[in-house]
């Protein structure tokens, strides 16, 4: 798979919603798109993350289900 042809999206973490995964290794966050400030989605992030971090999304249409 050649990732140089796939468009990437920059997003900013606006809120950390909580930890998920079997051992809590995944963080659920609300992100806001840098190019469209009105659009925000919920994503799962592996690894350390905090508010105001900038993430690169390879797949921008996918949204995570909310935690219960």
From Swiss-Prot:
One short Pfam name that applies is Ribosomal_S28e
Q: Which residues cross the membrane?
A: none
**What UniProt keywords apply to this chain's record, in alphabetical order?**
Cytoplasm, Ribonucleoprotein, Ribosomal protein
One term of GO molecular function: structural constituent of ribosome
Instruction: Tell me if Ribosomal protein is a UniProt keyword of this record.
Output: yes
- PROSITE patterns of this UniProt entry? RIBOSOMAL_S28E
Subunit notes for this chain? Answer: Component of the small ribosomal subunit (SSU). Mature N.crassa ribosomes consist of a small (40S) and a large (60S) subunit. The 40S small subunit contains 1 molecule of ribosomal RNA (18S rRNA) and at least 32 different proteins. The large 60S subunit contains 3 rRNA molecules (26S, 5.8S and 5S rRNA) and at least 42 different proteins.
Return the similarity comment: Belongs to the eukaryotic ribosomal protein eS28 family.
Q: What does this protein do?
A: Component of the ribosome, a large ribonucleoprotein complex responsible for the synthesis of proteins in the cell. The small ribosomal subunit (SSU) binds messenger RNAs (mRNAs) and translates the encoded message by selecting cognate aminoacyl-transfer RNA (tRNA) molecules. The large subunit (LSU) contains the ribosomal catalytic site termed the peptidyl transferase center (PTC), which catalyzes the formation of peptide bonds, thereby polymerizing the amino acids delivered by tRNAs into a polypeptide chain.
* This protein's name: Small ribosomal subunit protein eS28
- Organism name: Neurospora crassa (strain ATCC 24698 / 74-OR23-1A / CBS 708.71 / DSM 1257 / FGSC 987)
